[in-house]
A protein has these predicted regions:
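Gram-negative bacterial Sec-dependent N-terminal signal peptides
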Residues: 1-24
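Short beta-strand segments within Ig-like beta-sandwich modules, predominantly Fibronectin type-III
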Residues: 86-92
Length: 552
């Protein structure tokens, strides 16, 4: 108590001294100077400048033009160093030197080098040191018994030296809380509005330390249906900024948390999830659904995960792919084999291992039961598109349809170019579009139904069917995909422990309409590596590596 009294007295005394000296009173104008405290040769440090990235800061320019900027976040003992340069444009945009990669709950040491210029005079500053404390990582948590930390705690098993500079964005969410999943659509019914979870997004270094996280309260509100949803589809664009979507929004922010755009979906569409892909032409492919679809039986419904739109940088919808008009929404081969206990993020352990029959699907289609449920026809989850990519060589899109267990290439003319999936049930319209498996010598592989000889296998309830741009051309298409493995072979196994997942890369000869499996990983890991939902596989050219993230 005595210490606190001393501090208060000193504060009051300082205020009296300032007033007696003729300075402006606290709260008044500062005059021809800036009275923020500074520790270096430029301006003050502003923490979390845009309100959503607490482990960022800006060292303000202090009225100078800054150039030739470099930044080093000094690592903890045994920690991972983060270094980067800052363009003049970025320094102007942020009003100073952007700082990224601070440790949470720690007094960071940051070294910056720069040239400052004013009135034609320049000064070079090398390795100026700032001590910047960032508070502990903290966002909302769920009150469930199993929750023991704000963010997942990373357990680092092994780090190859060649990958020690990596940073990993973890796109996560907390389990459904009582203030989420409380609303459904009306006028018309259907859709997937109840897909709403509190976001938990962070960047980890290779030591398992959080170096960035999102504090989402400025952009996410579980009580506002147009500001809620599940944040998914994070992609880093060529300009370094991130795009993603959630619920009724698609957005773009830079790493500092600066909003580039945050838009509500165009009014004819609803329920973003999974995929927002930046195209080479500057537009975006966004996986949505229809907000009002008139079915052949006259019923109006909101559809579920079966529409892709192309939007330009101004938000104009320049094209759409309505999949019920392109594919067969009543192909039910995979639907009948799905494990009803784990349909993407809709987990119901009481239905584990259960399947649905053709008769049940037919009866369901006669009812008014629409929405995020497995079923045939528009208005139910017949397609479940969980990724979309673009091929600039022929102006086509590639979709991953979980509930058709197929990767499908579709042209701008809305015609199917090829289907990478088991051939059952596609009918005469699409039979010649199904790719033929071949071995490394180009010889056909014998397949009966959904089972093929040797190591070749199709993908089952897969995710992230992405074009490997650095290896593909107009004739040869390299496809990376995460094969989740549910309903493998169009059936449920005798024991759930027989299920497994794979990261796979295929080589498709688009002229010969053949597919070769050139790499896989995961089958040898068995059920321990099985991921019934979500997950991804992506090739990285810089280290000739494949990144695999899964939910196990």
């Amino acid at each position: 108590m005595k210490f606190k009294s001393t501090v208060i007295a000193a504060s009051v005394l300082a205020g009296i001294m300032s007033l007696s000296a003729g300075a402006y009173a606290m709260g008044g104008a500062s005059g021809a100077h800036v009275n923020y405290p500074t520790t270096g040769k430029i301006g003050a440090v502003m923490m979390n400048p845009y309100g959503i990235a607490p482990l960022t800061a800006v060292i303000r320019n202090g009225g100078y033009s800054l150039s030739d900027i470099s930044v080093r976040i000094v690592p903890k003992d045994g920690g991972q160093e983060i270094t980067y340069t800052v363009s003049d444009a970025k320094a102007r945009t942020h009003g100073g030197i952007p700082i990224f990669g601070l440790y949470a709950g720690y007094r960071n040491t940051v070294e910056v080098s720069y040239t400052k210029t004013t009135e034609g005079k320049s000064e070079r500053v090398e390795k100026e040191v700032y001590r910047i404390y960032a508070g502990p990582a903290n966002i909302a948590t769920a009150g469930y018994a199993g929750v023991t930390s704000v963010f997942p705690v990373a357990e680092v098993k092994k780090v190859d030296p060649a990958f020690s500079d990596r940073l990993y964005l973890i796109n996560n969410m907390i389990a459904a809380t009582p203030n989420t999943t409380r609303a459904v659509w009306n006028n018309p019914m259907g859709g997937a509005l109840e897909w709403n979870r509190y976001p938990q997004n962070a960047i980890y270094d290779t030591k398992g330390e959080i170096r960035w996280y999102m504090e989402p309260s400025k952009i996410y509100d579980p009580n506002n249906i147009y500001m809620a949803g599940i944040m998914m589809g994070f992609r880093q664009n060529n300009d370094g900024a991130f795009t993603w979507g959630y619920g009724q929004r698609y957005v773009k922010y830079d790493l500092m948390g600066r909003e580039i755009f945050n838009r509500q979906l165009p009014d004819g569409y609803a329920d973003f999830s999974h995929a927002m892909d930046p195209m080479q032409n500057g537009n975006y492919l966004v996986r949505v659904a229809s907000a009002d679809h008139a079915r052949p039986d006259g019923k109006h419904v909101r559809t579920v995960r079966d529409v892709i739109i192309e939007v330009d940088q101004n938000g104009t919808v320049v094209d759409e792919w309505a999949l019920w008009d392109i594919l067969d929404p009543y192909r039910n081969n995979v639907l009948k084999a799905l494990d009803q206990g784990a349909v993407c993020l809709n987990i119901d352990a009481t239905k584990a291992g259960q399947t649905i029959t053709a008769e049940q699907l037919a009866e369901l289609d006669k009812t008014d039961n629409f929405g995020d449920i497995v079923g045939a026809g528009a208005g139910r989850n017949w397609a479940h598109v969980n990724s979309v990519d673009y091929d600039p060589t022929d102006d086509s899109i590639i979709i991953s349809s979980r509930h058709q267990s197929a990767l499908i290439k579709i042209g701008r003319d809305k015609q199917v170019k090829w289907i990478m999936g088991s051939p059952e049930g596609w009918g005469p319209k699409f039979a010649d579009k199904v790719l033929k498996p071949v071995d490394k010598d180009g010889k056909p592989i014998k397949c009966e139904g959904s089972k093929c000889e040797g190591d070749f296998d199709w993908t089952w309830t897969q995710h992230t069917g992405w074009r490997v741009d650095s290896k593909s051309d107009k004739d040869v298409f390299y496809l990376s995909v995460f094969d989740n493995g549910d309903a493998r072979g169009m059936e449920q196994p005798a024991l759930p422990e027989m299920k497994y997942s794979r990261a796979v890369v295929y080589k498709i000869d688009q002229k010969k309409m053949t597919v070769e499996q050139i790499w896989e990983y995961g089958k040898e890991r068995g059920h321990a590596w099985y991921s019934p939902v979500t997950s991804l596989t992506e090739y990285y050219q810089d280290k000739n590596s494949v990144d695999r993230k899964s939910v196990v």
